[in-house]
Structures are given as structure tokens and as C-alpha cells.
Amino acid sequence: MATTSPSAMDHVSKKPKLADGEDAMDVDDKENRKIAKVAFDHETHMRIYYDSLFPAESMMKWLAYGNDLKHPQADAGFMQRREFCFTLPGDVFVRYQSFKDDKELRKELKSKLPSKIDIGPVFNVDPSKRLAYSGGAGSDRVFAPTEREFVMDIDMTDYDDVRTCCSAANICGKCWPLMTVAVKVIDAGLREDFGFEHLLWVYSGRRGIHCWVCDDRARKMSNESRAAVAEYFGVYKGADASGTVKRVNLTSPLHPSLQRAYADVLDPFWRRKILPDQELLTHEKTKDAILAMIPDAEARSRVESAWKGSDDSVARWEKLEQIVQRAIKADAKNYALRRCLHDIVFAHVYPRLDVEVSKHMNHLLKAPFCVHPKTGRVCVPMDPKTADDFDPMRVPTVNELLNELNAADGKVEATRMQKAVDCFNETFWNALEKECKGDLAAKTRENAATKGASATEW
């Protein structure tokens, strides 16, 4: 990575301090109102960021999947078929760009200074030449995607009916555990149920999380296969016509993957974090919605009576469980009642995906390491194994990184960006790079064996 002299950054404001007693994880809304602002000049600061901090080399190595190597089996034109989309200030979209290497990418970043970078699929031809391949149905000259990472998008706004602490773009330490649950459940499902190995988890910079599944077979999946994988996690089905009763797609007994999710993640988080922090059973709106999910009128009435004291949500949940379980013993064939405890937990805590993002190969998704234009936070990789410890409020902003770079005399390795790149490598790229190199070596051996067989036949 390039370095920047201290003099180039003398104008950057120092990192703001939080007020006494204020927790960095208290609240972060779309205007960052509770985190002191510093002056931000897009042109000046983003040019320094793209020149000195943005890990263009790591990004291009990943997206090339070994095809950037001078190897006889590498696809030399692979990267120039990958679409990049820049969003420029003023919401100007520049689509169908491609770059042969990290130097070319960095040059364009410094020139255009995008406020957002999106990554698209690998096409059959250079996307800049697409107009020559738009012959339509039946034509031999068709412009079409050939591969793309399978991606998942989880957004906190989809949980607004569960959150009592925040809404819309706001996030805090009380609702962020919903994202932690999503990472844990989806990561386990993709690895254990589908056998995927190379998953890159990225904080979106504001209120959500993205997952990039980068195994070769994931990148080659059809749109139909992508939809099937996404729907596998589609347990929550929204509210009923009344808008009150939440609907989930569960069986009794639970599917093994859902039983694993419930036992390992959902139930512990529900009791330890969600119930006490969101106070779901003391807030009038959420309390009534949960009561409405008890299908037996008599059991529902008993729960309501048991809640007339001043108990907290955890104590109220325990009473609800006891009453429902007694009702199940009295009517073992009431399958809706037998399922209702699971229904309540899954409806409130199970991951809620934006399925449309996952279904189509040509969907654009924000690139890792770009900067969220509303918060200034960098879209940093996450380690799913330590998802409990991830605090979005402590993710660095551009200004903070520039201050760190200035204080370290331009040494990138002394900034938190280096930690983000280390996380990218250690949790994701190192293993995938080894596999990519192994695949190229295997192709070389296969070709040598084929040539040897042909020579023998001749």
C-alpha cells in the first residue's frame, strides 16, 4: 500500500471524544447525531483514502480467484469481464466498468472518487463492449453473466416490528444482537447444510451485514439454485392480513437445521439478550402481538392473567412457557399449540433476508472496504466466530483512519485498516487463495495427462 506524508493530512480534525459516561455502542442513527461530527471534505479525504488506505490489491486478488497469476492455466481476461459500478456524488451511477488489475482500479478510484462501489458479476465479455453483444434472443452475440458470488443481505430495518429501542436507520447495542444471531445462524447453515467453505462476512457500514459465498460452485449457481438456497432460510413470512400475528414456516418436529439454530443460537439469545433488552413482553404493542400467537383462547387468557403483575419480560416468558406446556399436556393433538413457542421465538429472532438480493446473478452489491456515504464508516470484514464481540459503533470512519494515518507518519500498518485487511485474509482469503492455486495446479496436471494419453494413442 502507498503511504501519505503527514503534511498532506494536517487539516484533518482529531478523533472526536464521546461525552462523559456515553457508551460508543449507545446509539448510531443515520445522521450520526450522538457521535460528534468532524468536518469532512469528500474530494480531499476520499482521494487520500483511495490512494493510501483502500486495499485495492487485496480486493483484486480475491475477485480474480487466481486468474491474476502468470500461470498457463489462468484466464488472463477474467478480471476485465467483471463489472464494477461507481456511485458518484449526486447519485450519478457509472456502470459496466472493468479493470485489469489493482493499479488500474486505484487510478480510477482516485480520479472519480466514488461515494460507493458496487460489484457485479463476471460477464461473458468485457462489460464495456456489451453493446456489440446485445443481438437479442436467437443471436450468437449475447451479453450475459457467467458467474457471481452468492450473496446475502440482512438489514436491521426488516426487524422494526421487533425492535423497541430503535427504528429505521438507527441501531444500538440492544438491537444489534439480532444481526449477531443472523450471522451465527446463516454461517452454520451455509457451511453445515450446503457444504460451502469460503464465506466473507462484511459490515455494511450502517445498519446491516452482507455475506459473500465464494466457493467455485456457489459462483456458478443458476438463478434458480440461488433462489432455492435463499428460500431455505426463508422461515419468517411476515404478518398476517391484520398486521398483528407474525407468520413463520415451521414444521413439528423442527427440521434438523432449524432445531440446531434454535438450540445453539435463537433460544439462548432470546432469553439472554432479546427479551430483557427489547422488553417485548412489557411493551404494549409487542406484548399483544406475542399473545396473539398463542392459538388456544383459554391458554392465552391464562397467560394474560399471569402477566398482571410487574414482572419483567424474562419472568413473563417463563410463565407463558409453563402455561402453554400445561395446555399441551391436556391436548396433545393441538399441533398449533405445540408449535407456538417455537413460532414466537423464530418470528422475532430468526434471520430476515432480503431474498431478492440473493436470487439473481446480476445483482450489484456494495464492495467490502468502501465507505458508507451516510455514516462515513468503512465496510469492514467480520469474523463470524467472534460475531458476539463485533461492535458496529467502533468500526472506524474515514476521518478516524486519516487521523491514525497522520499520527503514524503514513504507515498503513499502524491503522485499524490494517486490522480489517488482516481479518479479511485470516478469516477468508488465505484459505481460498490456497484452493485457487491448487485448482490451477490440478488443471496443469490434467492437461499434461491428456496430452500424454493423446501421444500414446498416436
Describe the predicted segments one by one.
Residues 2-204, 216-223, 228-230, 235-347, ...:
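Signature for HUH/AEP ssDNA processing cores
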Residues 150, 209, 365:
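Residue-level detector of short, conserved catalytic/binding motifs and their immediate flanks
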Residues 184-188, 391-393, 399-401:
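HIT superfamily nucleotide-processing domains
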Residues 197, 207, 363:
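Residue-level signal for beta-strand positions within conserved beta-sheet cores that form or flank
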Residues 209-216:
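A short beta-strand motif that forms the metal-chelation/ATP-contact edge
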Residues 224-235, 383-398:
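Aromatic/acidic cage segments in peptide-binding pockets
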Residues 361-368, 372-391:
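Amphipathic alpha-helical/coiled-coil segments positioned at domain termini
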